[in-house]
């Protein structure tokens, strides 16, 4: 049985490894001239970020892999989690490569990303449905041993049956792309994700998912170390390489623990960002008017006069609160 010390050690190791990898990787990215292109229609304060090296997600991925594999607590679940993280990271890397090295601003087309992401998600869903003792069941937050409302009983788990695979695919793909949308301010995606990863590390540890607890702790440490280079003013951006990898990692943990329904709660910031984009597009197409000054949501607050650092800190704090709610939801 693992204890809190192992989680703490893993976070510290991941943090140190990232601090070591950063100075080794960032100068290399600068020499490759993989600078970020900033949208002209974005906040004017962001124009100074133009040319900042991107594809920094490789630092995160390498740190997570090294930290996880040196833990001595390796099993099939850990390999699955690492494989999914790397696979989503590769999709992001291809997208970044096309945009910043081949200089094609659009990168992968949306349908290409969705096909690749969906394929990984299908494999993950099939694996879990066939190997988990819960089969196609998922845990329902907030109900404990079950509750009855107006004569209708809601049980602790719900069996999705044939809907399991499409549902898991939807949640995984939605999570991955929501994290990608969140990565728009210095330190935002890394900070939000380290908090959520810490939440999963604690839950996984208390539920006996030893390898997943280590994996989540490795993500926490990697993101914490990455903030040294990614907090305002950022020396490097994680790019799609990092955001898709982190989104895939968080989604995979939730799938393997059968708690995918907790993601919209603890990952509320992720989904607020995604929903803001969806609502903005729908509103503009139907009425010609925009709901937000700019989407994703973090840009709306920037254009409303909030400093970039204020938006980031507030979103971090909201995520801490949501993770505390998540703890109650799974208790």
UniProtKB/Swiss-Prot annotation:
Name of this chain's protein: Phospho-N-acetylmuramoyl-pentapeptide-transferase
Keywords in alphabetical order: Cell cycle, Cell division, Cell membrane, Cell shape, Cell wall biogenesis/degradation, Magnesium, Membrane, Metal-binding, Peptidoglycan synthesis, Transferase, Transmembrane, Transmembrane helix
Record localization: Cell membrane
Membrane topology, record value: Multi-pass membrane protein
Any one GO CC term of the record: plasma membrane
Family: Belongs to the glycosyltransferase 4 family. MraY subfamily.
Catalytic activity: UDP-N-acetyl-alpha-D-muramoyl-L-alanyl-gamma-D-glutamyl-meso-2,6-diaminopimeloyl-D-alanyl-D-alanine + di-trans,octa-cis-undecaprenyl phosphate = di-trans,octa-cis-undecaprenyl diphospho-N-acetyl-alpha-D-muramoyl-L-alanyl-D-glutamyl-meso-2,6-diaminopimeloyl-D-alanyl-D-alanine + UMP
Cofactor: Mg(2+)
TM segment ranges: 7-27, 54-74, 78-98, 106-126, 133-153, 154-174, 195-215, 249-269, 311-331
Annotated function: Catalyzes the initial step of the lipid cycle reactions in the biosynthesis of the cell wall peptidoglycan: transfers peptidoglycan precursor phospho-MurNAc-pentapeptide from UDP-MurNAc-pentapeptide onto the lipid carrier undecaprenyl phosphate, yielding undecaprenyl-pyrophosphoryl-MurNAc-pentapeptide, known as lipid I.
Keyword Transmembrane tagged: yes
NCBIfam families: mraY (TIGR00445)
Coiled coil: none
Pathway entry: Cell wall biogenesis; peptidoglycan biosynthesis
Biological-process GO terms, alphabetical: cell division; cell wall organization; peptidoglycan biosynthetic process; regulation of cell shape
């Amino acid at each position: 049985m693992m204890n809190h010390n192992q989680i703490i050690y893993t976070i510290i190791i991941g943090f140190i490894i990232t601090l070591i990898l950063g100075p080794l990787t960032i100068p290399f990215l600068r020499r490759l001239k993989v600078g970020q292109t900033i949208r002209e229609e974005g906040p004017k304060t962001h124009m100074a970020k133009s040319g900042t090296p991107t594809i920094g997600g490789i630092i995160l991925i390498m740190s997570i892999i090294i930290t996880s594999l040196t833990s001595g607590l390796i099993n099939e679940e850990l390999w699955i989690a690492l494989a999914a993280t790397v696979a989503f990271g590769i999709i992001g890397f291809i997208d970044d490569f096309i945009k910043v090295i081949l200089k094609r601003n659009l990168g992968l087309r949306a349908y290409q990303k969705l096909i690749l992401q969906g394929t990984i998600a299908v494999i993950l869903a099939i694996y879990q449905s066939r190997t988990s003792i819960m089969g196609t069941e998922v845990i329902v937050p907030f109900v404990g041993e079950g509750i009855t409302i107006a004569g209708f009983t809601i049980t602790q788990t719900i069996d999705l049956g044939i809907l399991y695979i499409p549902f898991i695919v939807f949640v995984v793909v939605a999570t991955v792309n929501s994290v990608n949308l969140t990565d728009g301010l210095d330190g935002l995606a890394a900070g939000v994700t380290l908090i959520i990863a810490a939440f999963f590390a604690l839950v996984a540890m208390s539920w006996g998912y030893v390898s997943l607890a280590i994996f989540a702790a490795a993500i926490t440490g990697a993101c914490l170390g990455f903030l040294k280079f990614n907090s305002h003013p950022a020396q490097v951006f994680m790019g799609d390489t990092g955001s898709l990898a982190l989104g895939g990692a968080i989604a995979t943990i939730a799938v393997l623990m059968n708690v995918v329904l907790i993601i919209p709660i603890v990952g509320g910031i992720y989904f607020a960002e995604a929903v803001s984009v969806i609502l903005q597009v729908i509103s503009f197409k139907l009425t010609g008017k925009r709901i937000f000054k700019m989407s994703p949501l973090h840009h709306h607050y920037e254009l409303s006069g909030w400093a970039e650092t204020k938006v980031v800190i507030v979103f971090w704090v909201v995520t801490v609160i949501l993770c505390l709610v998540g703890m109650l939801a799974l208790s």
